[in-house]
């Protein structure tokens, strides 16, 4: 990626009220995006948001900027990120814009774009928008100003799309499901999808008030879901994050089922049904148990850098259709164009219904390896600890001891002066000792 001033790997994000997430910046961003996208001939942009209180302010600013550039805004209201990608495709809009900071707290927000085909904007278009941001705002003639309107049936359209990814011959009528919508964008979507497919649904995290998104609920904190699954004696629980592009599940015993396990279930079911094309893409953080379980099934596996953008790039490079991060981003290119928590969850439920198996039993073919992560802070003026001979020597010793049944990953944080030390292997006590041994070597530099 080139050096950019505003766009990161997942759009523009920050604390509301601090640059760049301010009304004046977002208005100019809307104008700049409008100027660039108008060159492609379309005059409409889909705008969706999650449930953060700042979404109202930011969508108004975006709409004003787009209108000044001559483009019309179609508002969806609170809507999952993948729903905006879907609606952008079906409306043939020039682009879709999502106002969300995903799994972050309510006081953060962000802006990300989808192109006409429901994928992330190409780098060249993002760069053109940044170049336009350096110019003074100008307004089109009054007769050419953009308008604003609402897509009144946006939720219903997306609910039907999600249901269409679940096999017609199957039903969820045997299942009692607790669904946790993180007080986020799936609150009025996911429970209805599951109920309409026949499930007995208990909904939590479905009372957004603008400031409670991701607050001790959702895919990043499943404790409330685990407790409710056990209390209700439910068959399973499903948690989404604030914008609905991640899913984490909980089995009937209260065990967390992460993105690695979800991908394993979906890939194995695809193999059984003769529908799996190629292999599966994980990340550097994917559990070694996933790699070994897929290998046992004869399914090729490749690792991408951490980030759903890089997972998708690796999938496209290899021509494969399934990819996931252990955090719960699951990308199924046969079904949709981006990570979609509801669609991924439905594929696991289809495997349960088709095989008459519990979520717990579907996971049993994959043994999760203990994965110990230690963060070590360092000072930038002491040089790169990863290049130090003592750190390299200790790392080599640990790798030799683990052999082919474990691995070591050392990487720098992209946002703080931290070295992340990850050691994975079959024996938890051993890998814990190894992780701290390497961390001590990093600290000593």
Swiss-Prot record:
UniProt record, GO biological process: carbohydrate metabolic process; peptidoglycan biosynthetic process; UDP-N-acetylglucosamine biosynthetic process
Modified residues (Phosphoserine): 102
One term of GO molecular function: magnesium ion binding
Cofactor note as given: Binds 1 Mg(2+) ion per subunit.
Cofactor(s) demanded: Mg(2+)
Active-site residues from the entry: 102
Cellular component, GO annotation: cytosol
Metal-binding in keyword set: yes
Disulfides per UniProt: none
Keywords: Isomerase, Magnesium, Metal-binding, Phosphoprotein
Enzyme Commission number: 5.4.2.10
UniProt enzyme class: isomerase
Domain of life: Bacteria
Binding sites annotated in the UniProt record for Mg(2+): 102, 241, 243, 245
Catalytic reactions on record: alpha-D-glucosamine 1-phosphate = D-glucosamine 6-phosphate
Post-translational modification: Activated by phosphorylation.
InterPro entries found in the cross-reference section: A-D-PHexomutase_a/b/a-I (IPR005844), A-D-PHexomutase_a/b/a-I/II/III (IPR016055), A-D-PHexomutase_a/b/a-II (IPR005845), A-D-PHexomutase_a/b/a-III (IPR005846), A-D-PHexomutase_C (IPR005843), A-D-PHexomutase_C_sf (IPR036900), A-D-PHexomutase_CS (IPR016066), Alpha-D-phosphohexomutase_SF (IPR005841)
Stated role: Catalyzes the conversion of glucosamine-6-phosphate to glucosamine-1-phosphate.
Family stated for the protein in its record: Belongs to the phosphohexose mutase family.
Name of the protein in its database record: Phosphoglucosamine mutase
Organism of origin: Escherichia coli O7:K1 (strain IAI39 / ExPEC)
Lineage: Bacteria, Pseudomonadati, Pseudomonadota, Gammaproteobacteria, Enterobacterales
